[in-house]
C-alpha cells in the first residue's frame, strides 16, 4: 500500500514529503497541494508546497553532490542504477496503486509502467557504460595543411545539474527516462513531478534512495507551478532542462537562455490510410493508438486521414471494436477510464460541441459522467473544425476523408505539431515516400504511433519539441564533449 512499509518515511501524517539532501522533509511553508482522484473527484493525496528558498537549498546540494559523483567510476554509477531498477520492480505494487488513484491509469497498465521503468533504468546503465567508456582520437594530418604533430583526445563529460519535469500521463516512466541518463552521465538531478502523478514519482525516488545514491545527488520538489515553476526553470544553478508536457514547454524554452533543452511538447499524430491497406490491421491500430489510456498519450493517433474508397469499411470496423471496450474505473482494468482533470474533460467537450455544431457525424452518442468520457469516433470531420487541429488528449478521434495521398500529407504538414505519424499500405515504396514527405519526428509504417522501445530515437518537429530522446540520445544530450590536444615537438609518423 502507498506510503507504508519501506515507503513509510515518504509520508508525514496525511501529507507526502519532498526529498532533499538524502532525506524526506516537510516544507517550511506549512502549505500543501491537493491531488484529486480523477475517478472520485475527491482529494486522494496531499504533497508539500515547497518554497523558493527550499529550491535554492536543493540546487546548492545538487551542485556539491554532482562534483563528487562525476568522479565516481562509471562502473559504480551503473551498479547503483541496476540496484535502483531492481528495487523499483520489486515494489511495483504500491507505485502502481498510486498511478491508479492519481491519474486513473488502468491497473494492468500501471504495473506495466513501473516494470518498464525498471527495465529502462537497467538498459540505461548498460548503454552508459558502452558509450561513455569510449573516447575518440583525432590526428592533425587528416586536415589539409597540417603535419602529424597534434593528437586530439575527446570524451564526454557531464553538464552539471539536470532539471527533469515529466508529465502526468507517465510520471514514473518519463521521469526515469530523464533520471537514468542524467545519473549515468555523471550529472545530479532535480525532479519536479507533475501534481497529478507526484505521489507515484515520490515513491519511485525513494527506490533510488534505497539503492544508496549519495546525498544531494537526487532531489524531488513538489509544489505549485505559480510558486516554484519559473523559479526552477530559470534558476542559475540549472545546467540542463529535460521537459515533457504541453504548451508550458514553449514558455520554458523562451526563458531558458543558454541552458541545453530536451523537450517533447505533444502532437497531433496523423494516421494516413491508403486503399491497399490491411483494413483489419488499420482498425485494430486505430483503436489501440487512439483510445489506449483514454487517448491521453502524446503518441496517440489524433486524426485519421483515410482514402474515401475505404473509409466506410474502416469506420464500420472501428465502431465494432469501440463497442467492445470496457468503460469504467481504473481499478477494474477498464479500457476507457476518466481523464485526468475536470478541466481536461471540459476542454474535450468543447472540441466535441464545436464538431457537432459544424456538422461532424457522431458514430456514437456523446456521453460523459464527471471526468469519464465514453469513446467517440467523429466521421466526416472538416478542416474548419477545431478537433481537426487541436490535441484533445482524450477518447475522441476525428476521421477526415481524403481523395489523394497528397491531400493527407498536406493536412499532416499544415499542423503546428510534428511528433509522430503513421501510414498504412501494403506498398513499401509508397510508405517510404510518404514517410519522407511527412513532417514528423517519427513515422510508423503499418502500426500506430508509439514511444518505445525506449532505446529508439524519439523526437518531435516544429512545436512538438526540441532535441531527441531515447536512452542513447538522452545520455549524449546530457553530456558535453571535452577535448585535450597533445602537441608534439615534431611530426610523428607510423612505422614504415
From Swiss-Prot:
Keywords from the UniProt entry: Cytoplasm, NADP, Oxidoreductase, Phosphoprotein
GO cellular component: cytoplasm
Free-text activity regulation comment from the record: Insensitive to magnesium or calcium when dephosphorylated. When phosphorylated, 3-fold activation by magnesium or calcium, 2-fold activation by potassium, inhibited by ADP and AMP and insensitive to ATP or PPi.
Record field: catalytic activity: D-glyceraldehyde 3-phosphate + NADP(+) + H2O = (2R)-3-phosphoglycerate + NADPH + 2 H(+)
Gene Ontology molecular function, alphabetical: glyceraldehyde-3-phosphate dehydrogenase (NADP+) (non-phosphorylating) activity; lactaldehyde dehydrogenase (NAD+) activity
Residues involved in NADP(+) binding: 192, 195, 230, 391
CDD domains documented for this protein: ALDH_F11_NP-GAPDH
Active site: 264 (proton acceptor), 298 (nucleophile)
Site entry: Transition state stabilizer: 169
Subcellular location field: Cytoplasm
Residues that, per the record, bind NAD(+): 245-249
Chain sites annotated for binding substrate: 116, 169-170, 297-299, 451
Pfam families: Aldedh (PF00171)
Residues found modified as Phosphoserine: 404
PTM comment text: Phosphorylated in shoots and non-photosynthetic tissues, but not in leaves.
EC number(s) on file: 1.2.1.9
Main subcellular location of this protein, as a coarse class: cytoplasm
Subunit structure: Interacts with 14-3-3 protein when phosphorylated. This interaction is released by divalent cations.
Family: Belongs to the aldehyde dehydrogenase family.
PANTHER family for this protein: ALDEHYDE DEHYDROGENASE (PTHR42991:SF1)
Function in brief: Important as a means of generating NADPH for biosynthetic reactions.
Protein name in UniProt: NADP-dependent glyceraldehyde-3-phosphate dehydrogenase
Source species taxonomy: Eukaryota, Viridiplantae, Streptophyta, Embryophyta, Tracheophyta
Amino acid at each position: 500500500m502507498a506510503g507504508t512499509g519501506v515507503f513509510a518515511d515518504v509520508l508525514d501524517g496525511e501529507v507526502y514529503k519532498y526529498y532533499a539532501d538524502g532525506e524526506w522533509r516537510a516544507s517550511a511553508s506549512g502549505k500543501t497541494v491537493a491531488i484529486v482522484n480523477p475517478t472520485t473527484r475527491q482529494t486522494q493525496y496531499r504533497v508539500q508546497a515547497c518554497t523558493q528558498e527550499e529550491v535554492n537549498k536543493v540546487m546548492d546540494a545538487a551542485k556539491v553532490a554532482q562534483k563528487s559523483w562525476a568522479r565516481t567510476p562509471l562502473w559504480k554509477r551503473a551498479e547503483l542504477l541496476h540496484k535502483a531498477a531492481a528495487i523499483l520492480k520489486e515494489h511495483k505494487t504500491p507505485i502502481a496503486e498510486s498511478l491508479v488513484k492519481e491519474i486513473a491509469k488502468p491497473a494492468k497498465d500501471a504495473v506495466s509502467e513501473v516494470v518498464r521503468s525498471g527495465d529502462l533504468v537497467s538498459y540505461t546503465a548498460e548503454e552508459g557504460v558502452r558509450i561513455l567508456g569510449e573516447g575518440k582520437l583525432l590526428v592533425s594530418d587528416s586536415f589539409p595543411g597540417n603535419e602529424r604533430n597534434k593528437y586530439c583526445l575527446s570524451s564526454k563529460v557531464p553538464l552539471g545539474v539536470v532539471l527533469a519535469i515529466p508529465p502526468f500521463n507517465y510520471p514514473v516512466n518519463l521521469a526515469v527516462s530523464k533520471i537514468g541518463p542524467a545519473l549515468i552521465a555523471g550529472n545530479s538531478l532535480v525532479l519536479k513531478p507533475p501534481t497529478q502523478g507526484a505521489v507515484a514519482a515520490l515513491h519511485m525516488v525513494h527506490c533510488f534512495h534505497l539503492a544508496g545514491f549519495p546525498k544531494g545527488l537526487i532531489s524531488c520538489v513538489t509544489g505549485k507551478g505559480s510558486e516554484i515553476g519559473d523559479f526552477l526553470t530559470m534558476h542559475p544553478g540549472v545546467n540542463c532542462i529535460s521537459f515533457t508536457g504541453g504548451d508550458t514547454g514553449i514558455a520554458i524554452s523562451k526563458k531558458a537562455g543558454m541552458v541545453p533543452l530536451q523537450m517533447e511538447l505533444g502532437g497531433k499524430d496523423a494516421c494516413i490510410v491508403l486503399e491497399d491497406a490491411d483494413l483489419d490491421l488499420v482498425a485494430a491500430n486505430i483503436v489501440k493508438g487512439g483510445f489506449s489510456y483514454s487517448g491521453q498519450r502524446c503518441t496517440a493517433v489524433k486524426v485519421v486521414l483515410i482514402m474515401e474508397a475505404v473509409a466506410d469499411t474502416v469506420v464500420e470496423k472501428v465502431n465494432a471494436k469501440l463497442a467492445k471496450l470496457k468503460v469504467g474505473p481504473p481499478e477494474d482494468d477498464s479500457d476507457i477510464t476518466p481523464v485526468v482533470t475536470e478541466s481536461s474533460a471540459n476542454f474535450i467537450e468543447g472540441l466535441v460541441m464545436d464538431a457537432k455544431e459544424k456538422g461532424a457525424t457522431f458514430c456514437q452518442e456523446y456521453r460523459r459522467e464527471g471526468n469519464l468520457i465514453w469513446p467517440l469516433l467523429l466521421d466526416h470531420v472538416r478542416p474548419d473544425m477545431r478537433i481537426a487541429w487541436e490535441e484533445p488528449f482524450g477518447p475522441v478521434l476525428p476521421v477526415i476523408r481524403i481523395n489523394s495521398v497528397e491531400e493527407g500529407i498536406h493536412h499532416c504538414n499544415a499542423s503546428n505539431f510534428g511528433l509522430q505519424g503513421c501510414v498504412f499500405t501494403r506498398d513499401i515504396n509508397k510508405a517510404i515516400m510518404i514517410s519522407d514527405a511527412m513532417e514528423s519526428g517519427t513515422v510508423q509504417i503499418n502500426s500506430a504511433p508509439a514511444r518505445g522501445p525506449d532505446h529508439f530515437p524519439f523526437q518531435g518537429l516544429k512545436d512538438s519539441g526540441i532535441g531527441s530522446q531515447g536512452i542513447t540520445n538522452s545520455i549524449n544530450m546530457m553530456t558535453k564533449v571535452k577535448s585535450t590536444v597533445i602537441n608534439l615537438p615534431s611530426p610523428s609518423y607510423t612505422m614504415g
